């Protein structure tokens, strides 16, 4: 009888011990980080499908060291420029070769989105395969050479009949926005194709090879604004920003410059109307509302996605981020995690009618084949 009682007591003690151990393990598990991803000693390759010096390159090189500080393990983030094909070359390479271990990311621009939206034959990538962790809206400024003799948008019509040259990455790149804008204003411009990025276009402008240009806000603020004081650039207009109702407003980063709809009214004497303007606005939204983004490749594990999302969120929520980013990116709200995913879903939603109209325009105007 005593033996039986002793066995019962021993069993009870064992069960109690096991329960306590399980509770301890559970406690430790709950106390552990949500994701155990650690990139200590690793090297992240950030593909930027544009040449050095343009808006996307400037944007990526600004973000890289800041995000690195917030990624588990603080890996070095190295920007790798792969220009070509209006950014399709680098995006195709990412789609084909990127590993899903969190060490390969892609930075896209509107010039990557437009060929995708238009069904460009060079596109072998699919945004639906990727996961966005950051969406950066931006603006853009159109400017001209002082040699053209105008001082503001009010004098734009005096450029009609003059030989205007614009260095372009391609008609299906983000350059679609300025090229269509000038066409709507009845201002003829010769597009010189073959640029590897907007940075190359800006350098062509600085060398005097072309006399009109546009840059996204990041490159404009950093690379072009200093030239205004030197008398080498005349700012004409910004593209503007969209308010909550989808109406164009002046870009708060360039409040003294009229936006495109204002310039339309200056030139045509009436408010914007017609299919061409509607299509311009649709592609402006697609190219600028979520203009640049950081993407992880297909098959990336959720814990790696979470680690990157958390790192980007910490970066943009830092106390000094707004001050630092205004000098490089302008004052635009950054969308992260789920908001970034939603931003790109909206930006890549173009109606079939708008797509068909612009494809026909590109074929007629620039002999683009689809």
Indicate residue ranges for each PLM-predicted region:
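N-terminal secretory signal peptides that target proteins for export/translocation
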Residues: 1-14
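Bacterial N-terminal signal peptides
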Residues: 18-29
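Sec/Tat signal peptide C-region and signal peptidase I cleavage site
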Residues: 30-36
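Hinge/capping helix and adjacent helix->loop/strand transition within the periplasmic-binding protein
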Residues: 37-40, 69-74, 93-104, 113-209, ...
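Extracytoplasmic "Venus flytrap"
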Residues: 45-63, 83-86, 167-173
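Ligand-binding pocket segment of bilobal, Venus flytrap-like solute-binding proteins
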Residues: 83, 167-269
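C-terminal lobe and pocket-closing loops
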Residues: 224-313, 353, 357, 361-370
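Mature extracytoplasmic/periplasmic domains
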Residues: 240-245, 260, 313, 317-346
């Amino acid at each position: 009888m005593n033996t039986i009682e002793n066995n019962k007591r021993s069993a009870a003690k064992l069960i109690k011990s096991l329960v306590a151990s399980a509770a301890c393990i559970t406690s430790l598990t709950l106390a552990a980080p949500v994701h155990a991803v650690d990139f200590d000693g690793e090297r992240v390759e950030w593909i930027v499908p544009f040449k050095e010096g343009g808006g996307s390159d400037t944007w990526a090189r600004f973000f890289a060291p800041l995000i690195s500080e917030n990624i588990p393990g603080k890996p070095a983030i190295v920007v790798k420029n792969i220009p070509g094909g209006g950014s399709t070359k680098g995006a195709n390479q990412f789609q084909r070769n990127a590993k899903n271990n969190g060490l390969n990311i892609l930075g896209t621009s509107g010039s990557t989105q437009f060929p995708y939206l238009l069904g460009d034959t060079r596109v072998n990538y699919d945004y639906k395969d990727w996961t966005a962790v950051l969406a950066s809206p931006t603006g853009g400024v159109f400017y001209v050479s002082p040699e053209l003799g105008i001082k503001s948008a009010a004098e734009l019509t005096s450029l009609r009949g003059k030989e205007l040259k614009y260095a372009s990455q391609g008609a299906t790149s983000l350059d679609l926005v300025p090229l269509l804008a000038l066409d709507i204003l009845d201002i003829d411009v010769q597009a010189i194709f073959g640029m590897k990025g907007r940075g190359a276009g800006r350098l062509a402008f600085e060398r005097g090879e072309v006399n009109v240009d546009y840059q996204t806000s990041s490159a404009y603020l950093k690379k072009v604004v200093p030239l205004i004081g030197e008398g080498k650039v005349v700012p004409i207009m910004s593209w503007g920003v969209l308010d909550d109702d989808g109406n164009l407003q002046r870009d708060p980063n360039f409040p003294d410059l009229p936006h495109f709809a204002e310039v339309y009214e200056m030139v045509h004497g009436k408010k914007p109307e017609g299919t061409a303007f509607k299509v311009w606005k649709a592609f402006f939204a697609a190219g600028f509302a979520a203009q640049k983004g950081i993407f992880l490749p297909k098959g990336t594990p959720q814990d790696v996605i979470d680690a990157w999302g958390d790192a980007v969120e910490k970066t943009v929520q830092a106390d000094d981020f707004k001050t630092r980013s205004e000098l490089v990116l302008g004052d635009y709200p950054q969308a992260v995690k789920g908001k970034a995913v939603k931003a790109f879903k909206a930006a890549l939603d173009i109606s079939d009618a708008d797509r068909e109209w612009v494809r026909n325009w590109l074929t007629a105007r620039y002999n683009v084949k689809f």
